[in-house]
Amino acid sequence: LGLDKSMISLGSCTMKLNSVSSLTPCSWPEVTSMHPFAPESQTAGYRELLESLERYLVSCTGFDACSLQPTSGAAGEYAGLLVIRKYFERIGQADRNICIIPRSAHGTNPASAAMCDMEIKWIDDSRGMDVEEFRALCEAHKDRLAALMVTY
């Protein structure tokens, strides 16, 4: 089983969006073999790489800061939804807690939303995402809408 040989199923959205060639550096020992307790004097290159990525992401998004962990999967969903919840709390709109999720979403989507105290509103996507139904759902909850989670 491999990304370049067969379909990767549930829980691998991030992997599906990256070509195999872009993942090659992830197999290089120079990238993957740093020991977690390596002395600071031996990790300057890693720190420079990660800190410049953080600065780049902050400049692109307009956020005050960013986190490179967690990177994907249910932990990434949860982290993203926590950011959304905290944002609305910070601007005095803590009542914005509705998350629209397609019925076909994998179970981590509603689980992550529920763990963030979000109220889930389902959208039927058995015929694909109906734009008019989506607009109507957004309009019906416009004062409390916080997020939309769409996976494939």
What does each model-found stretch correspond to?
Residues L1-S9, T14-S21, C26-T32:
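Flexible inter-domain linker/hinge segments
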Residues L10, S67-A75, I101-A105:
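Active-site nucleophile and cofactor-binding loops and adjacent substrate-binding regions
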Residues S27-S41, V58-S59, A114-W122, K142-V150:
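Gly-rich Lys/Arg/Thr-decorated short loops/hinges at beta-loop-alpha junctions or inter-strand turns
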Residues V31-T71, G76:
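Conserved N-terminal alpha-helix of the aminotransferase class I/II PLP-enzyme fold
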Residues Y87-G107:
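Conserved PLP-anchoring active-site segment centered on the Schiff-base-forming lysine
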Residues R103, W122-S126:
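Short beta->alpha connector loops at strand-helix junctions that form conserved
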Residues M129-Y152:
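Active-site phosphate-binding strand-loop segment of PLP-dependent enzymes
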